[in-house]
Amino acid sequence: MSLLNYPNQNGEVNMNTEHNPYKRLAERLDTLPNGFPPSDDGSELKLLAKLFTLEEADLASQLRIILESSTQIAERLGLEHTSTRQMLKSMARRGLIRTGKMDDGLGYGLLPFVVGIYENQLGIIDEELARLFEEYYQNSFPIVLSIQPSIHRVVPIGESIKMNMQVAPYESAAGIIENAQSWGVQDCICRIQTRLIGKPCKHPVDMCMVMSPVRDAFANSNEIKPLTKDEAYATLHRADQAGLVHSVSNNQRGDWYICNCCTCSCGILRGMAELGIANVVASSAFINTVDEILCNACGLCVESCQFDALTVEMVASVNGTRCVGCGVCVDTCPDHALILVRRPEEEVKPVPVNLLDWGMQRVKDRGIDITPLL
């Protein structure tokens, strides 16, 4: 379907009409497990209009979760093959849609807005995009953050966990690094976004770690700085020293990034500190404990905790309902009085096996049907 006649005579687009391709794309994105709920002020449509042309939004609104070749998409939608392929390639190059290898070439599919489209705009984010995202964040993001299972899961660095304790690879940041073949780091779009809207935080920007099961995966990237495994560990320790919380995608297999987060800029953790949503991030399998003999009540752990999970009177004490098991406080204790131990089994939420399992659980929690996307 051509959109050349869609705008009115003044070149304007009516954002409220049901025929608006941005509205249809927003509705399509909201059928994904991640969610992209409508706002009261139409900020989600303005966001999409900033990133997609009308024609691109129309095409993207008809993509599926599963990958299809450009030929399959063109034939399914009754579109001209060459122009369809060029438009799909352009959107994939800008991180607006998903792409991957198929037996007969490249395939294309629908990509969530978060985590997905938005994070891919690291190279082009400006003040306008930052402010549009903030409008949407304040208006509708609480819905996204309230859906279970959570998008992110906290993992400790590994050294903060009690020795001789069995730890699955997906339960610690070190285990995730060890399972990769390539490592890299890039700037954090969350901290760039808050800086652009005039609310910068003190934490370092070059903190988003990415991994891959493929060797030399980031050798030709313009935005990702390739790292050796040792450099990846050094970056993790640098984040730890900055008091940042390590979080990953909330599944056991396919953890290919480690976000090093703060409650002042991180889109996920701000949900807890700023929006008051309790379960924005899944806790780790561990909880902090205090050795009352070693503790001298200095209070450094209280200052380092981003979740207000510690208090000090005669000695430090832990609020188990607020502690997410990140281990940040463990490294700040000069007397080594803190250590992470495994939570009681009944308190540990099962971690989804993979992205599909995670998605199906969120779909069930939302009560939506994703059959039209398959």
Question: Locations of the language-model features?
Answer:
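Short, amphipathic alpha-helical interaction segments positioned at domain boundaries
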Residues: 105-142
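Catalytic cores of enzyme domains
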Residues: 141-287
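Ferredoxin-like iron-sulfur electron-transfer modules
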Residues: 108-110, 247-253, 275-325, 343-346
